[in-house]
Amino acid sequence: TKDEQHTREYLEAKDIEKYAVKRVRYLEYDTPRCPGELSRPTFRELYDRDKIIINCLGTINCTLDNNIHYLHNHSIYCAVLWKDLKGVDNKSLSASVKRYSHHSRKEMEEFSEAVCLEYLIAILNSSYAAQLLATLRGDDYHIYPEHIRNIPIPSAPSVVQTRIKHLVHQIIEYKQSGKDCIASEKELDEMILELYKPDDSDEKK
């Protein structure tokens, strides 16, 4: 229950499903103890940004956090656009760039200007991504960050991303209000599948 001491919304993987949060709990925060006395804390800016929340076991379920900015435990990963971390100086960010990217941090910040979180979550929640993950994971029940990094992200014109963004917000709204969103989810999944189809110019090469 939210009170004067337990002020920060908190999630675990069992609290989320595709495009929805099923349950919210509250942690002590902004007190003399927390977060100042936490052991090995992650950097605050990771949580205080719009992000995609991803479970790390079983079938992938992603939801959008573009308002509340939840805290979460180790059963969840979160994905933040590089442009939204511009100016944040942190050793783990520098290490990630050096270890996992062929591009500079500045380049990735520029690349991320061309996509929105709604577009990325639509890809991650798609049937196509589920197939790719099944291939990447084999018999492994875990979803690791490298699995997510290895999902190719097709480029899409802004008009397509705008339509996808609208559908994502529609699905989220329908789920929050208990409305049937099957038709919207089907349309969204078909749009994502279409993006992965080779175009005629690719087939002629």
Region annotations inferred by a language model:
Residues 6, 14, 155-205:
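Non-catalytic DNA-recognition/assembly elements of restriction-modification systems
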Residues 1-159:
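Polybasic, glycine- and aromatic-enriched phosphate-binding surface used to engage nucleic acids
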